[in-house]
């Protein structure tokens, strides 16, 4: 898993892996670069975004597998938007708790030192998700 978003570096890693261990799978660790990684030979992605929006990540995988460029573009841009919402606070996993609650899935509260969004922040986030067609 390469958690970076530098696709030139990912391509270099892929060349090394393909030369040394062709049976080894290298995957991007960010859904924001899943399409690029797939085009460079990755067969999957380790995507934190899939914790909250698995349907979008699975749809992107299907579009990539089918070569549907228009759908790939649409979904990749949607994932980048979702990641922006997940990043409104420094720790994306903590925001994911609130995103899941907004979607109707109560997974409790984040453990300290992480914290939940304020009611205002949650309300604003819900509105952004609605306006984006994500809920």
Language-model-detected regions and their locations in the chain:
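Conserved short secondary-structure transition element at the edge of the structured enzyme core
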Residues: 38-43, 80-115
